């Protein structure tokens, strides 16, 4: 595959699909502990089962060389590889993985980070936003403010350095995807989703919108 000449900064929302795709029984366990921040708050037996699952998936990601099989393991990997026309990522791009600050959310994103680095993508950063995985609306709103603050502090510099900023929103929780879709109009050049066929990406360009987003957030 010919490497693209455009420098890209790719921001991917990350959920727990890489964990829940392992079967119905483990999915229930993950849902039960989705909002837990400290793994020591989980009973020993359940915690060990989840830790073993994470180790197994990490090994599978390292050993699996088929893109089609990798895409089935994770919505995030599916979206990222489709962004590269069903090839492995370009090693010269920058990737931010937006995750919740829960234990399972951070572990799932760490698996993706390790996979990307294993594909020689060196500039990969996991961004765990405080309270973005909160179970209460009041706490989640604090997470929203934190995510907006991160975008405003981090992403404009990439555009100034002539990078194309892509929001890759195929993974992550629906509430976070909806928020990121709004933020994309201010901080990204395009947003990508998997089309209904499951084999193509829908590219949504940034609209020419100007608004003091931080001021709006403070008012609400």
Which positions does each model-derived feature cover?
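Long, low-complexity, Lys/Arg-enriched
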Residues: 1-164, 178-220
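Glycine-rich beta-strand-to-loop/alpha-helix junction loops that act as flexible
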Residues: 170-171
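Polyanion-engaging groove/track-forming segments
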Residues: 174
């Amino acid at each position: 595959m010919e490497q693209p000449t455009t420098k890209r900064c790719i921001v991917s929302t990350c959920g727990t699909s890489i964990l829940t795709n392992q079967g119905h029984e483990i999915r229930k366990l993950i849902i039960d502990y989705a909002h837990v921040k400290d793994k020591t708050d989980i009973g020993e037996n359940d915690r060990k089962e989840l830790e073993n699952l994470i180790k197994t998936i990490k090994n599978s990601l390292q050993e699996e060389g088929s893109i089609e099989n990798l895409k089935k393991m994770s919505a995030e990997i599916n979206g990222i590889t489709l962004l590269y026309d069903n090839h492995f990522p370009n090693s010269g791009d920058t990737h931010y993985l937006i995750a919740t600050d829960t234990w399972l959310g951070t572990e799932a994103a760490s698996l993706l980070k390790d996979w990307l680095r294993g594909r020689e993508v060196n500039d990969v950063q996991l961004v765990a936003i405080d309270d973005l995985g909160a179970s209460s609306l009041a706490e989640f709103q604090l997470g929203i403010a934190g995510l907006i603050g991160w975008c405003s502090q981090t992403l404009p510099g990439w555009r100034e350095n002539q990078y194309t900023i892509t929001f890759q929103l195929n993974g992550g929780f629906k509430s976070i995807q909806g928020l990121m879709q709004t933020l994309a109009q201010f901080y990204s050049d395009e947003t990508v989703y998997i089309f209904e066929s499951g084999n193509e990406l829908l590219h949504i360009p940034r609209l020419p919108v100007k608004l003091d987003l931080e001021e709006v957030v403070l008012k609400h």
